[in-house]
Amino acid sequence: MAYLVLIGDLIASRHSQNRKDLQDRLKAILKSLNSRVPKPVSPYTLTLGDEFQAVFNTADHVFDDMVQIMAALHPDQVRFSLGLGNITTELNPEQSLGMDGPAFYRSREGIDRLKDSGDLLYLGGLPDNWALLAEGALRLLSQRLQRWEANRFAILHGLLVGEPVKTIAAKLEISEQAVYKNIHSGGLEAVKQVLSALTGILNDCLAEDGPTA
């Protein structure tokens, strides 16, 4: 069976002005995501250094989770690598530790690539006919994300989970006009479209369980 492994890595966290606050915010957002229904099949777990990981059997919430984490940790940045493939060990439903297989290898390889490239997003394990398109889309998106303010991440997250503009504005305590301005300036509807398309492709691969071994 194919799974989707997410590894996140805080960038330059050791140089953060308030590292303890950053760690506390990371723990809080991961705890919140682990309490969501549906949960990851193996929960968000802090691992070595400033990394964390989780395992999914559906891509439905993966990208909005990533955006929510970025919003919570801003201005500190996070690189995310997704690995699609099999897990050759028994799945651990208690914590994302002690597992192995192609999905983990691809996700780990992606983190190494991101450290070299300076990008924020990587996806490995897609069939060849989708891989280059996904890589290009995520690299373009990475360049946008590095220039965003916290509110833009929060607005994108609201759009991804289907919140109306009025609700997003109330949560952020800004005007609806400011929300619409962010949507337009950041091309957020286009970003939402790209992430929705990638979610569909990933779910097709997870369901087929064919080209991801």
Task: List the model feature ranges, each with a label.
Residues M1-A213:
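Regulatory and interdomain segments flanking nucleotide-handling catalytic cores
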